[in-house]
Amino acid sequence: MAVLLIIIAQPYFFLMTITGTHFNYYHICHRKLWLFSNGINMEQESDLVYEGTLLHEYAYPQRNSKYEEVVIDGIKVDYYDSKNKIIHEIKKSNKIDKAHEWQLKYYLYVFEKHGISGVKGLLEYPLLRKTSEVILTDADREKIKYISDDIETIISLQSCPPLVQKGICKKCSYYEFCYTNESDI
């Protein structure tokens, strides 16, 4: 007796967990969000991303032993102070502060969703010597649900969103990809 096995393959983005990076890219550029979510990753080639990685590793060297790295639901929080319930997010520049803030709010939301309540966030810009506190409000929780749905809509598009020229494009790791031959995408 033969058994017919039917496998319905879904594109991997339906299986993808939304991460803080998705929230960050959503606020920066929908095209970057789509490219990243569809497996086109240019960060490994970017000197600017490398500089950010170095800053992250060396700005607060004492943190590696003091705070914990936490992975929940596909998000990776590098510095979590469990004693004081604070997520520390380190960024190089505050030029896209809104994107950084929503990335951190999403982390707070995921922690809360997993029963870790009362967590605060700190956005830290060591090169600017600036720190700002981030909290999650009821309005933010509602907006996160809306943004999550919008992210899923964007990443499930059959083709890449059109290029939208912005002032931050030249510092983006996808710059050459986007501006080399836009009609091929």
Please report, for each region that a protein language model flagged, where it lies by residue:
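Structural motif
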Residues: G20-F23, A99, C160-G167
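Targeting/processing segments of secretory and organellar proteins
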Residues: A2-L4, A9-Q10
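Active-site metal-binding core of divalent-cation-utilizing nuclease and nuclease-like domains
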Residues: S46-N84, W102, R129-E133
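Solvent-exposed, charged helical/coil patches
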Residues: F13-N64
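Cysteine-cluster motifs in flexible loop/terminal segments that predominantly coordinate metals
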Residues: C29-L33, C160-I185
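Short helix-capping/linker segments at secondary-structure and domain boundaries
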Residues: F36-M42, F111-G118, T180-D184
